[in-house]
């Protein structure tokens, strides 16, 4: 009896070993078809086409094409590919290769290696795409330019139907050399989490960091940037009807050829209360205007009417955006010069409109404030800065306070008050 159970169990394992990969292969094929439909329906610049699909028990092969479109010009770039699929018990691994290879005919950018693009999918719908680029060297003889680097890795994690994606990248080094300038990047990393909120609007959190960037012009002094980072965060508010967005750019050090090291530098940008529906309308209207301009270039007799309608739609959607209320600006600006720090902030707010007041002019409701403080020595010692600040000082828009030049301005009721000097503004909308 025990022997019979062992034989039966072994038989079940054999059947499962055959059936499960086959079932996985079937589901993988369905997932690719569904993924293509989702990608093609979510935007207009990329189209995934899946053609012949030969499915086997433990592996499959299929061919397809990627179409990259420029929405403004209508130009297309077609990239045909072949894919080899290995089936497992809980998922599949797909290896993609361009039909025409990774490099133009006669070129050897990657030496004996080649990039590898794979996608690992699971039965429950999750997927991980990974692009691995080996060490490379690309030379453009026409422009006398060379690009070479250590290679890198890019990963994209997502799920079918989830409208969420995580992106990461790691690029140790990249050099762009030409007769005019050499550019060297070191340790570039990216971490980005994204979720679709509505239409073309995505929210999430991300960080882009670069350990160093060296710029070496042929006819000027070299500049080195160390510790450059960009942080962004967008989140939905008011039951997903609006969003807040924040961006921070930081630089630890700026090293000049003379040996001076300046830093740290910081610039922050904030956007609050952006209406999602109105912003989607703005995006659609701008796209329509670009398409109409392209149609006009190709002699479409209806293009002028399309352009006029698109311009009208842009104006209406912008008015709806402002009527919903918003706040935008740079709450913190901190830059370091050889003569001391430059500090400031710029904030603009619109309270929004209610009821019949939506049809009123928008500009009168705008309010804002601006502050700027720069070293007096910077204006005195730097000719370019002096030429820019001299007219402002003469008109009282910049005032001297100790060893600083100050500008304080407020905007309210169509009056811009700069250092106590009122400047009436015309209504623009």
Task: Name every feature range the model reports, one short phrase each.
Residues 1-5:
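Positively charged n-region of N-terminal signal peptides that target proteins for export
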Residues 6-8, 16-429:
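Glycine-rich, small/hydroxylated-residue low-complexity segments
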């Amino acid at each position: 009896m025990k022997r019979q159970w062992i034989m039966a169990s072994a038989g079940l394992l054999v059947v499962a070993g055959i059936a499960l990969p086959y079932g996985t292969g079937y589901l993988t094929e369905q997932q690719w078809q569904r993924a293509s439909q989702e990608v093609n329906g979510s935007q207009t610049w990329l189209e995934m086409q899946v053609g012949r699909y030969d499915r086997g028990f433990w592996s499959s092969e299929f061919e397809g094409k990627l179409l990259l479109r420029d929405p403004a010009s209508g130009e297309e770039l077609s990239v045909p590919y072949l894919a080899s699929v290995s089936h497992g018990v809980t998922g599949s691994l797909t290896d993609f290769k361009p039909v025409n290879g990774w490099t133009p005919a006669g070129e050897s950018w990657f030496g004996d290696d080649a990039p590898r693009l794979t996608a690992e999918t699971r039965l429950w719908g999750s997927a991980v795409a990974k692009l691995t680029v080996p060490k490379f060297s690309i030379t453009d003889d026409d422009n006398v330019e060379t690009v070479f680097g250590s290679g890198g890795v890019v990963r994209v994690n997502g799920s079918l139907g989830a409208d969420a994606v995580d992106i990461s990248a790691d690029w140790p080094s990249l050099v762009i050399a030409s007769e005019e300038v050499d550019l060297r990047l070191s340790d570039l990393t990216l971490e980005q989490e994204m979720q679709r909120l509505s239409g073309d609007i995505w929210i999430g959190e991300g960080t882009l960091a670069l350990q160093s960037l060296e710029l070496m012009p042929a006819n000027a002094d070299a500049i080195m940037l160390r510790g450059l980072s960009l942080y962004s965060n967008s989140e939905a508010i008011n039951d997903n009807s609006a969003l807040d967005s924040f961006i921070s750019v930081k630089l630890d050090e700026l090293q000049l050829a003379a040996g001076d090291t300046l830093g740290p530098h910081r610039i922050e940008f904030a956007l609050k209360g952006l209406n999602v529906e109105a912003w989607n309308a703005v995006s659609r209207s701008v796209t329509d205007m670009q398409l109409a301009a392209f149609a006009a270039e190709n002699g479409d007799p209806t293009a002028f009417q399309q352009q006029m309608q698109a311009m009208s739609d842009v104006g209406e959607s912008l008015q709806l955006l402002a009527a919903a209320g918003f706040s935008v600006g740079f709450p913190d600006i901190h830059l370091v010069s050889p003569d001391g720090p430059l500090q400031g902030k710029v904030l603009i707010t619109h309270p929004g409109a209610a009821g019949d007041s939506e049809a009123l002019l928008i500009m009168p409701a705008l309010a804002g404030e601006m502050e700027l403080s720069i070293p007096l020595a910077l204006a005195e010692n730097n000719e370019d800065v002096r030429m820019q600040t001299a007219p402002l000082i003469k008109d009282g828009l910049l005032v001297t306070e100790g060893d600083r030049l100050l500008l304080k301005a407020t905007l309210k009721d169509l009056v811009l008050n700069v250092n106590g000097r009122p400047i009436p503004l015309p209504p623009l909308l």
